[in-house]
Amino acid sequence: MISVLRLGHRSQRDARISTHCGLVARALGASEIIYSGEPDPKLVESVKAVVKNWGGPFKVSYEKSWRKVIAKYKRKGFSICHLSMYGLPIQTIIKKVRKRRNVLVVIGAEKVPGEVYKLADYNIAVTNQPHSEVAALAVLLHEYFGGKE
């Protein structure tokens, strides 16, 4: 099971990009996305509408505390994979990640707190260049599922 945690959503600034994170997560094989940061019922309803119209068991929810989400998933035995341009190259780590049955993928919006890097089992870089968290999520899911998403 792949779950995605979107950190630090800002309703005015991130509505579109956070929606795209949910759409990519759903389309490329994740089971759910959890948003943290500012509450944004429109965002959650928008992704739920896509699930209703296009089908599938995908879940979307909001949790104020990202720390609680990470702690909960660690207790459930999930591996925590944080996507960051400062991580290990995806090419060198993806085989290990694929062996993990349950993975929580963490993607940022605003500046990611240093604590996330420490809590993660893997800090993974899709490239060492700045780019979109949507792109990083898409590449990770594609690589995790070996193109069979």
Q: Where are the model-predicted features located?
A:
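RNA substrate-binding interface of SAM-dependent RNA methyltransferases
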Residues: M1-M85, F145
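Short C-terminal domain-edge/linker segments immediately following a structured domain
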Residues: I33-P39, K64-W66, K111-Y117, A135-V139
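Short, well-ordered alpha-helical microsegments
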Residues: L43-V44, W66-I70, I90-Q91, P113-G114, ...
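Long, charge-patterned amphipathic alpha-helical coiled-coil/hairpin "stalk" segments used as oligomerization
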Residues: G87-V126
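Structured adenosyl-cofactor binding patch, chiefly the S-adenosyl-L-methionine
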Residues: V116-E149
